[in-house]
Amino acid sequence: MTHQYLIEIGLEDMPAHVVTPSLQQFHDKTVAFLKENHLDHGAIDQYATPRRLALLIHDLADKQEDVEEDVKGPAKKIAQDADGNWTKAAIGFSRGQGMTPDDIVFKTIKGVDYVYLHKAIKGKTAAAILPGMLDVIKSLTFPTRMKWGAYDFEYIRPIHWLVSLLDDAIVPMKLLDVDAGRTTQGHRFLGRPVTLGNAADYVAALKAQFVIVEPAARKQLISDQIHQIAADHQWQIDLDADLLEEVNNLVEWPTAFAGNFDEKYLKIPEAVLITSMKDNQRYFYARDASGKMVNAFIGVRNGNADHLANVIAGNEKVLTARLEDAAFFYAEDQKRSIADDVDRLKAVSFHDKISSMYDKMARTRVIADLLADRFGLSATDKADLDRAASIYKFDLVTSMVGEFPELQGIMGEHYAQLAGEKPAVAQAIAEHYEPISADGALPESLVGTVLAIADKFDSLMSFFAVDLIPSGSNDPYALRRQAYGIVRMIAKHDWPFAVAELQTTIADALKAAGKTNNLDFAAHQQDLNAFMIDRAKQVLQGQKIRHDIVDAVTVRADADLAGILDAAKILSAHADDTDFKPVMEALGRVLRITKKQQVKVDVDTAKFENPSEGQLYDATVATAKKFDDEPTEADYQALKALADPINAYFDATMVMADDQAIRQNRLAALLQLAALIKQFGDVSQVIVK
């Protein structure tokens, strides 16, 4: 015999972005609860609207399985005295298991007799276990929480009702002043309370009260309605997945509608129109058959088609007000030159402990120039980069960005184009913010990429200089994201980026240019270096590189980021080779024996005592001449070829000879080889089987 169990949490409207993850969390914790309580079950349907989270569990077992188990107790010599009487230990053990000493049997384990009790545990019924679901409800976590009434209890929103039905029977539970029952709520305006006769009635009963509880069905309905409106008007609609998800979690009974705005607003930059409609009002913008934006939008109301004309008029009025403001700001911004806006950045603080935004831009310009030389940019790209670096933050003081902060960079590109800046300069202004998330798009242009790296590295050096270093989960200036972005960009272009050396070089360049702003860039250089190495680890882990290889390639504090990434890829590419194990063992042996050794003598080949010493040294010298500055596949193959000479060397040579001169000479030779191996990190940490 199996059952259906319905559990619903009824709340005030939740923020849209919380609904889907909260439902998944509710499901996962319920599955864990059932598993912990040994209650078998079938499929679990998940339901959610802004006002509710609900689960319908199918084929729920009537009860737990009856269990028989043997419980081990103390040794026989402890359980009985010399006369065979039960001791307090035996009596207490049996009482604790709900049994008596008469139930005790003995079993021999490795020659020792132990007390055992055979227990038959009758399974609890589902009805007896399910009140524990209250703990699952209480355990849900949310990004923000609130209290209500006089209660100390916190939740995403106040809970107004609970439904807990095992088939047609209420499973009792109480949270604060809310008793679980069989009554749920229909649509806030169109429906009424619904008393459920059975858990299976849930979906149909709420649909009759203008609530579609299945998220997928509701989303499909929204999509179908939007596509129908678009077809009727011959529009193209970008059915953005994130916006569709958000709108879906704002409504219980969706009705899509079309609205319009004055054509004159199409003169506003498209990015502003999209932001106003999509981000601010949650509308879907429309294009004609040629892809040109039209003065129309599609919205979704939480209700039916009654009085839809009033709804449309209200939405059009709100959007028109936003667009009127945008048009005004757009006109005002064009009254000033880029030079005017750059000068105004002197009054804009980057951070009160660091400098103005104007000074930050000046530092970034110095860094960008230095990086351009290292990365081998052309003269044209260098000129474009220098121009972009001298103005790239100017849009921060524009009225449009003040009203729409999410358009910073985008408006900078647009205004730069209007002012006649070269396309490469304008594009770099937009791209310097990228990537805007851990897995966000990287800049497409070389100029934009270098500007993005320079800007982010200036931020890192500056915040570390004033000891504003991320700790734990605290990272208010998104420095981890910026550092991660730098590593991703370096990886894409395989550009050299030796963090430790680069910090010193940049600090010297800024000092020479008079652009340090009294910042002590030497204060936390080692901390920033380690910080960047950690981000390289993250990038490699995201590429599914083995943890031991990641650890091996990131041990060098002075390592180049590109070199770290290349070494990891090369080692990972060969990890399944049949000869990988002996190669790593041979190279690792060299690193282990030279670890912490400091030898200040030159290699004297006259002190070699066997042929293997000369053979390995000659091979090392020849390999060093062909080695690149950073790890390459050819370098790996060269080291691989040294595996046999290394093994032959150790078979014939006692490195730590009693004669100090011989020992120092051998270590000096091995240290030269170790320096080559260390291009790939500490390969002795690579796990081989």
UniProtKB/Swiss-Prot annotation:
InterPro entries according to UniProt: Gly-tRNA-synth_bsu, Gly-tRNA-synth_heterodimer
Entry EC number(s): 6.1.1.14
Classification via Pfam families: tRNA_synt_2f
Alphabetic keyword roster: Aminoacyl-tRNA synthetase, ATP-binding, Cytoplasm, Ligase, Nucleotide-binding, Protein biosynthesis
Cysteine pairings via disulfide bonds: none
GO cellular component, one term: cytosol
EC class: ligase
GO biological process entries: glycyl-tRNA aminoacylation
Reaction equations catalysed: tRNA(Gly) + glycine + ATP = glycyl-tRNA(Gly) + AMP + diphosphate
UniProt keyword Aminoacyl-tRNA synthetase present: yes
Gene Ontology MF term list: ATP binding; glycine-tRNA ligase activity
The keyword Nucleotide-binding is annotated on this UniProt entry: yes
Domain of life per record: Bacteria
Family membership: Belongs to the class-II aminoacyl-tRNA synthetase family.
Subunit: Tetramer of two alpha and two beta subunits.
NCBIfam families listed in its UniProt record: glyS
Annotated protein name in UniProt: Glycine--tRNA ligase beta subunit
Gene that this polypeptide is encoded by: glyS
